[in-house]
Structures are given as structure tokens and as C-alpha cells.
């Protein structure tokens, strides 16, 4: 029985060699490994004794030879046995190998590419893969931490095929990890900005280093301006498929306003009424494109949440849309293209540091997606559920009248849920998200949050709000905040906050009375609501009714499904049971 030893990390080497020789195993060693064993007084043959070839190229070629790999890869079958006899090759039953310290080398400051290259192990990786491939016969030890357990079993003749299987898996994992480190290093050296993008830091400033990269080929987006951060890319790469799918499934340009990996707003480009233009702060614009309408709606749905958003647009960005973006506070935008004048407008934001990404509209992500949580890799099939009009065909309520306008809103609300942190509930109306409750552990709390946002959105249409007279010096965020406090009935009666609120106005508006609020909210009708999972109790339906919801979409599966449907029937709602749960994390 032969064992081949070729290690960089010589931890435990001599103890292992001693155990092997005590059982009559003949040792073969390469270079420094053989030297260390020999100097300890044990007998070991150099690899060159079976290859009849010396180490060459300064040690770059030591074990790459048919006499070595034939002995490792040979199976216990007649044809392989015949080949070994004809070539005078002995079988090798045990391989002990670990690799040059590539990771440790590149971690050193100011390491050069030639220095890194010299730590790329070739023969070692080949030994590991060859022995692991033939693990039906060969034992491969790639980790010194396994020597003691192996020795105990080997000396007591208790080494099993299961042990060889485990060692082989570890060897394959070792070579995969090693190659990944090499690829990562050279990706940064030779494909920075193409296959790889170095980020300032991760989710927080202390989480450095950080990067975005593709394992195969170039990144599907180009940075046209600015420097995207980790959170920017999380928002961009979650919001882009949302608008892409809305465009494909509804046929109208779409926009999304993202904050912290959930949409603050999403919409398609339905024309804006004069009232809506006032509500969304675009009444001074005379000409609108569908894309501009889409972003005005997406941004205007929840202006407080959209402050500092990342924008996704389904179509080439035109000048009209760029002008709306240019006067709002946002972090960046992703779109399939930009008109030259529009791009120049966007490049002026943030003193030239505004993040502008151009997405490849033909890019299709891999079917299997992987992420790490606390060092554990989780893998799943990508959520490629198609959300179009056909999804809502199963109507389980007595009222089955689903007009085209409601179907459009259902597609918008449900698609938004697909890219919203769960649990989530979404209200939509007029081609846009009007209230979204995300990331709550309780569905009723999601529902209340979404419903309250929808109520606030509708109250911003109130004549008292539309008639507010702001000072010319009042900035857009100040106006948004003042309106938000007003419609929430949260303006303090006195004090510095009250003074600050009043300072935005030429004329202090009269407060909305409880009666005015209730009467105006009662005029909001035909609202759509979608849920990313079933409604567990009828209390959700009662909350929907408070905000004028007429059309509901949610999956079934609760023991209370019938009670929920019965309650929806009490309010003459149209309830579509969809065959999808849409959790997103």
C-alpha cells in the first residue's frame, strides 16, 4: 500500500507519517514534504523515484505525471489493472495534500500579481481532485484537522467507505473554495467595473470590504454616473424586475420608488388629472410622457417614505422624467437607457455624484439563487411567478365583476408584494400603489399600516390640502412633511414644532375636522388590495372596508378562508383567490 504526501501546511505531518509506516504503508513525498519526513528518521521515497523525472521549473512541476495520477485514478477493474502492469505503475491508496496559501498571500498589504501567481497551486489541486474522484478506493486527506480521527480508524482497521466519502467531499469543497478565491482576486485585478464592482462598504460603514460581482461574465448593468453603495444595489436590483414585469404584463411604462429593499411606491404611466398633478407636486409641468406619469405617481404615493429613494424605470428615461427626478431628493436611478439630454440632467445631481445605472433589459438571472445567512448558504429556485391578468381568474366571492381598471391595479399591487419584505399587504388605485404595509410579523398590522397610508394618500386630495398656500422659500420635503402632519391630525397645538410647521405657510390652514375627514375618506372607493399570504381572520376584511377596498386578491389555505370570504361578501367585495404565496426576504 502506498501513500502520497504533498503538503504546504505540515501540521501533524510527522505523527501521520509515523502511523502510516507502522501499518506497513510505503510513503511517497514531494519536495519539502519528503525532506521533513526523511529528516525525522522515517523512510520516504521521492515522487521522482516513480516518475523518473526531477522537479522542474523551480518546483512548479512535481507531481504532474501519469505514474502519479495513474496510480491514484486506477480502479479495481481488469482494464485498469492491465494498464498499470504494462506501465509499471503502483496503485496509490492514500493521498495527503493541502494547498499553497493563496488567500493568506493576497491578504498581505501591497502584494503584487506575480507574488499572488506563485501561490496558485496546480499539482496540489490536481492531486486533490484525482484522489477525490476515485474515493471509491482512495482516501484523500486535505485537512490536518482530520489526521487524528483518520489515524485512530486506520490503525484499528475501522476506516469505512463513508469515511472516504466524507474526506472526498471535503477535498472537493477545498478546491472549489480555493478556485473561488483565485477567481475573486483576478476578477478584481482584470475585470473591475465589468465583472466586479468594489463598493465603499456593505449595509453599514463598518462592514468593509464589500463588492458586487458576477461569477460568470460581465455585470448586467453599467455605472454611468456616481458610485453605487450596497443598499443602492439591493434597491436597484429588487426594483428593476418589478418595473420590468409591470411593463411586460400590463403594457404601460412603469416606475418604482424603493427604500430599504421595499417599494415606497410603484405605478404605471396612466395620465394624470389636474388634481393628481397638484397632489404629486408636478402641476407646473405642462407636458408629460407615460414614463413621467409613472414616476410622478410612484414618487407621489408616499412622499415621506420616498424621500431619498432609489428609482427604477422600465423604459428609456426621457427629459420630462429626468426633470421630475432632478428636483427630488433621491439616491439614484436604474433604467434600460437614457436620452442624452436626460442623462446630462441626471449627472448634475449631487454635484455629479448621483448614481445612474443602465440595466441590460435582456439580462435573465440564473434559475437558482444563493445567499448566505450567518455563514450558512441558502439556495432556492428564483421566484419567476408570472403576475398577469389571468392570475385573478378564480373569483370566490358572490360579486364577480372585475373591470379592466381593477385588474391593472391588482397586477400592480401583487407584483409590488413580490418584491416587498414580508409580511406585506398592498393597496392600489388609479394604476399605482397607494399604501403598502411591509415587514410586519402580523398580517393585520400590515393591513392597518397599508390602509393608514392609503387613507393619508387620499386625504392629500382634500380641497383644504390642495388650497394650502406655502411660502416660496418652503422646500419640497418641508411641504411634504407639513402636509403629512396635517392629514394625520398630528400638528402640535403649541411649541417649537408647531412654530416650525407654521413657518412653511403664507396662510395657516384651518384644520380638518373629524367630520370632514370621515366624509372625505368615505368618497374613496374601488380600491384594490392584495396580500402576499392568506388573511387568517375576518378582521382584515373589516379594515379593508374602512378604506374603500372593493377588490381583493390573496391566496387561500387558512382554516378561516370561508369566514373571510363570507365577510367580504357582506361588503359586496370581489375576492380573487390566487394560487401563489409571495413571501419575500
Swiss-Prot record:
Hydrolase as UniProt keyword:
yes
**MGS-like domain: which residues?**
1-142
Instruction: Give the binding site residues for 5-amino-1-(5-phospho-beta-D-ribosyl)imidazole-4-carboxamide.
Output: 200-201, 260, 308, 331, 423, 443, 534, 581
Molecular function (Gene Ontology), one example: IMP cyclohydrolase activity
Per its record, the protein catalyses:
(6R)-10-formyltetrahydrofolate + 5-amino-1-(5-phospho-beta-D-ribosyl)imidazole-4-carboxamide = 5-formamido-1-(5-phospho-D-ribosyl)imidazole-4-carboxamide + (6S)-5,6,7,8-tetrahydrofolate; IMP + H2O = 5-formamido-1-(5-phospho-D-ribosyl)imidazole-4-carboxamide
NCBIfam families per record: PRK07106.1, purH
Provide the protein name.
Bifunctional purine biosynthesis protein ade10
User: What is the protein's species of origin?
Assistant: Schizosaccharomyces pombe (strain 972 / ATCC 24843)
Amino acid at each position: 500500500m502506498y501513500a502520497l504526501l504533498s503538503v504546504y501546511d505540515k501540521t501533524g505531518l510527522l505523527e501521520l507519517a509515523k502511523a502510516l509506516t507502522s501499518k506497513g504503508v510505503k510513503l511517497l513525498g514531494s519536495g519539502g514534504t519528503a525532506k521533513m519526513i526523511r529528516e525525522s528518521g522515517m523512510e520516504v521515497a521521492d515522487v521522482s523515484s516513480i516518475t523518473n523525472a526531477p522537479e522542474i521549473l523551480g518546483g512548479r512541476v512535481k507531481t504532474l505525471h501519469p505514474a502519479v495520477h495513474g496510480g491514484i485514478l486506477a480502479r479495481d477493474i481488469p482494464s485498469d489493472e492491465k494498464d498499470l502492469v504494462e506501465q509499471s505503475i503502483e496503485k496509490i491508496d492514500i493521498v495527503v495534500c493541502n494547498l499553497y496559501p493563496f488567500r493568506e498571500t493576497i491578504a498581505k498589504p501591497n502584494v503584487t500579481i506575480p507574488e499572488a501567481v506563485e501561490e496558485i497551486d496546480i499539482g496540489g489541486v490536481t492531486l486533490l481532485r484525482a484522489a477525490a474522484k476515485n474515493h471509491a478506493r482512495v482516501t484523500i486527506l486535505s485537512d490536518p484537522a482530520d489526521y487524528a480521527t483518520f489515524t485512530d480508524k486506520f490503525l484499528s482497521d475501522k476506516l469505512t467507505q463513508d469515511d472516504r466519502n466524507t474526506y472526498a467531499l471535503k477535498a472537493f469543497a477545498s478546491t472549489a473554495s480555493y478556485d473561488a478565491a483565485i477567481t475573486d482576486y483576478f476578477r478584481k485585478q482584470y475585470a473591475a467595473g465589468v465583472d466586479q464592482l468594489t463598493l465603499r462598504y456593505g449595509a453599514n460603514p463598518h462592514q468593509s470590504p464589500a463588492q458586487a460581482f458576477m461569477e460568470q461574465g460581465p455585470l448586467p448593468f453599467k455605472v454611468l454616473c456616481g458610485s453605487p453603495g450596497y443598499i443602492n444595489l439591493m434597491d436597484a436590483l429588487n426594483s428593476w424586475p418589478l418595473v420590468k414585469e409591470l411593463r411586460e404584463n400590463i403594457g404601460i411604462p412603469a416606475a418604482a420608488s424603493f427604500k430599504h429593499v421595499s417599494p415606497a411606491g410603484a405605478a404605471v404611466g396612466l395620465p394624470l388629472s389636474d388634481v393628481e398633478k397638484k397632489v404629486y407636486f408636478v402641476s407646473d409641468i405642462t407636458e408629460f410622457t407615460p414614463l413621467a406619469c409613472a414616476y410622478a405617481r410612484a414618487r407621489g404615493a408616499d412622499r415621506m417614505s420616498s424621500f431619498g429613494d432609489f428609482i427604477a424605470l422600465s423604459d428609456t428615461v426621457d427629459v420630462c422624467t429626468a426633470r421630475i427626478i432632478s428636483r427630488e431628493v433621491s439616491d439614484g436611478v436604474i433604467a434600460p437607457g437614457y436620452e442624452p439630454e436626460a442623462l446630462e440632467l441626471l449627472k448634475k445631481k449631487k454635484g455629479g455624484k448621483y448614481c445612474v445605472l443602465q440595466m441590460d433589459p435582456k439580462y435573465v438571472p440564473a434559475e437558482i439563487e444563493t445567499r448566505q445567512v450567518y455563514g450558512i448558504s441558502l439556495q432556492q429556485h428564483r421566484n419567476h411567478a408570472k403576475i398577469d391578468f389571468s392570475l385573478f381568474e378564480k373569483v370566490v366571492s358572490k360579486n364577480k365583476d372585475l373591470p379592466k381598471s381593477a385588474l391593472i391595479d391588482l397586477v400592480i399591487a401583487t407584483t409590488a408584494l413580490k418584491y416587498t419584505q414580508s409580511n406585506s399587504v398592498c393597496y392600489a388605485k388609479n394604476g399605482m400603489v397607494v399604501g403598502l404595509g411591509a415587514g410586519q410579523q402580523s398580517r393585520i398590522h400590515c393591513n392597518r399600516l397599508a390602509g393608514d397610508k392609503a387613507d393619508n394618500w387620499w386625504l392629500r386630495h382634500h380641497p383644504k390640502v390642495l388650497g394650502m398656500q406655502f411660502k416660496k422659500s418652503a422646500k419640497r420635503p418641508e411641504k411634504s412633511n407639513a402636509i403629512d402632519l396635517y392629514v394625520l391630525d398630528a400638528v402640535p397645538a403649541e411649541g417649537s414644532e408647531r412654530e416650525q410647521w407654521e413657518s412653511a405657510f403664507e396662510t395657516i390652514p384651518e384644520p380638518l375636522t373629524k367630520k370632514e375627514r370621515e366624509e372625505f375618506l368615505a368618497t374613496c372607493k374601488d380600491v384594490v388590495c392584495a396580500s402576499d399570504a392568506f388573511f387568517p381572520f375576518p378582521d382584515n376584511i373589516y379594515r379593508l372596508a374602512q378604506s374603500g377596498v372593493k377588490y381583493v386578491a390573496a391566496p387561500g389555505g387558512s382554516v378561516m378562508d370561508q369566514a373571510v370570504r363570507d365577510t367580504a361578501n357582506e361588503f359586496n367585495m370581489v375576492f380573487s383567490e390566487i394560487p401563489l404565496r409571495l413571501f419575500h426576504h
